Design a protein with these regions (language model features):
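Active-site beta->alpha N-cap acidic-glycine motif
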Residues: 1-33, 66, 71
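Generic beta-sheet signal
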Residues: 1-3, 38, 100
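Solvent-exposed loop/turn segments at secondary-structure junctions
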Residues: 4-7, 41-43, 82, 104
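Hydrophobic pocket-lining residues within nucleotide cofactor-binding pockets
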Residues: 5-6, 40, 48, 119
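Short acidic, glycine/proline-rich loop/turn micro-motifs
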Residues: 10-11, 46-48
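C-terminal active-site subregion of NodB/CE4 polysaccharide deacetylases
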Residues: 30, 47-155
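Histidine-centered catalytic micro-motifs
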Residues: 34-42
């Protein structure tokens, strides 16, 4: 994960975590993987005005295009925070956007508010097997409820 220019100090939420280098991202792109945007400075986009959001989207797309050779087609909202304004602006820059909402995306999903599965929940063999199971949607829904309760208890 690249969150800032090389040599910049760690962001608090990334302290001690390894990030991919631009070279590694370039090799992943060459191997056929898409490199998506996560913005330039990882702000809460819901607190920015339209110009600030646009600058984050434009800056990240330009940096990725310059370093990897192709602009980002997808976005992962920082912190998973999004609202109507961020979704509207995302449409102008990206083909789709992922939230931090836990769930399974389907054909009827809003492509600018895609739910996703965090692989953290599938690190054990028993839960990993759910990825190919018809029970995946139910499992994701239960995990989503538990996660929402946990987040509310933190406030």
């Amino acid at each position: 994960m690249i969150t800032a220019p090389a040599g910049s100090p760690d962001l608090p939420f990334m302290r001690g975590k390894r990030r991919l280098t631009w070279d590694q991202l370039g090799r992943l792109h060459e191997a056929g993987m898409e490199i998506g945007s996560h913005t330039v400075t990882h702000p809460d986009l819901t607190r920015l005005d339209e110009a600030g959001i646009a600058a984050e989207f434009e800056g990240s797309r330009a940096a990725i295009a310059d370093r990897v050779g192709a602009p980002a087609a997808s976005l992962a909202y920082p912190f998973g925070f999004y609202n109507g304004r961020t979704r509207t602006l995302a449409r102008a820059y990206f083909d789709c956007a992922c939230t931090a909402d836990l769930g399974v995306a389907g054909t009827s999903s809003d492509v600018y508010a895609l739910k996703r599965l965090e692989m953290h929940y599938f690190r054990h063999a028993a839960t990993f097997a759910l990825l190919a199971s018809p029970r995946l949607t139910q499992y994701a829904a239960v995990r989503g409820v538990l996660r929402a309760v946990r987040l509310r208890l933190r406030c």
